[in-house]
């Protein structure tokens, strides 16, 4: 009897697999537990599963156990997701992209020279895990995401396993920045086990990452596809609709190392939307300074500073 027709424990929004299970090569860094893919197959019951970044073949092992067909591809075996056409119209795609450059694959997990000899291209030039900048990685990841989603048959699904990266005090979130085409059906949190961070004591305010995400998107229309994507921008607080007068005045003063004249505050705020939206903006600045003694200090006549000791 095929695995996916058995009675299994339903998927929930949090999954955990302390024991990895059998399938794929556990020496292949970043390899996920086949139990996750087995549970996805058991829950959604596809007749076939495709994986275009298959790594060591964990998806095939899960599909074989479930008794369904699998089609697997990877850069190390002649398939470049950025330039090759997807040959199928998949019903279900499992995608486990690299987590930026945390683990590099070409010429680390496999020999680039072997790929060059067999397929005629240098995988290091095409490897998403060798992209230097985060922004360029996101662009490549999102192109690959849209390419796979576009190939889905109507009603098909993609399950994307991804994680977050921390570098130099900043979080780089794949979940936040990956493009989300179609219907966003589920986000599953997957606990990580046997991580390097489990054995490491961190100083400062570093919070170790002990989870990944599984994002499931569904194609509900063959032609018109809704897309949810992140747009990064920089906004001046003096132009932000939600900023109060106290916020704006404090922001200007926070840049100053010594008390400044009231005229300086006028100059800094006048060109911006906060002032342009209020006919009595000068009066509002003076009122804001006077009614917030906890935050602003009147140092001498006409000069103000930010009280940096305020709670």
Which ranges hold each PLM region?
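Class I S-adenosyl-L-methionine-dependent methyltransferase catalytic core
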Residues: 1-292, 298-311
């Amino acid at each position: 009897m095929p695995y996916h027709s058995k009675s299994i424990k339903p998927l929930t929004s949090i999954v955990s697999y302390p024991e990895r299970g059998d399938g794929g090569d556990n020496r292949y860094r970043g390899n996920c537990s086949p139990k996750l893919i087995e549970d996805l197959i058991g829950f959604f019951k596809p007749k076939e599963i495709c994986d275009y970044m298959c790594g060591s073949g964990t998806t095939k092992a899960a599909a074989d156990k479930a008794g369904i067909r699998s089609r697997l591809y990877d850069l190390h075996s002649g398939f470049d997701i950025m330039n090759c056409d997807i040959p199928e119209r998949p019903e279900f795609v499992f995608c486990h992209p690299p987590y930026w450059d945390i683990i590099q694959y070409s010429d680390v997990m496999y020999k680039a020279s072997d790929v060059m000899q067999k397929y005629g291209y240098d995988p290091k030039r095409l490897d998403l895990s060798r992209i230097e900048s985060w922004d360029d990685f996101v662009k490549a990841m999102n192109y690959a995401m849209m390419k796979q989603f576009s190939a889905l048959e109507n009603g098909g699904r993609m399950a994307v396993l991804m994680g977050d990266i921390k570098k130099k005090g900043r979080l780089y979130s794949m979940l936040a920045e990956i493009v989300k085409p179609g219907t966003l059906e589920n986000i599953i949190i997957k606990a990580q086990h046997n991580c390097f961070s489990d054995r490491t004591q961190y100083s400062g305010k570093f919070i170790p990452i002990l989870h990944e995400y599984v994002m499931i998107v569904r194609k509900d229309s063959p032609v018109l596809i809704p897309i949810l994507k992140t747009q990064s921008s920089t906004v001046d607080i003096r132009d932000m609709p939600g900023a109060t007068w106290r916020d704006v005045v404090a922001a200007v003063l926070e840049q100053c190392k010594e008390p400044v004249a009231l005229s300086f505050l006028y100059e800094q705020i006048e060109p911006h939307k906060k002032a342009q939206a209020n006919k009595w903006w000068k009066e509002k600045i003076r009122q804001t300074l006077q009614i917030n003694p906890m935050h602003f200090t009147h140092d001498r006549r006409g000069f103000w500073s930010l009280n940096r000791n305020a709670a």
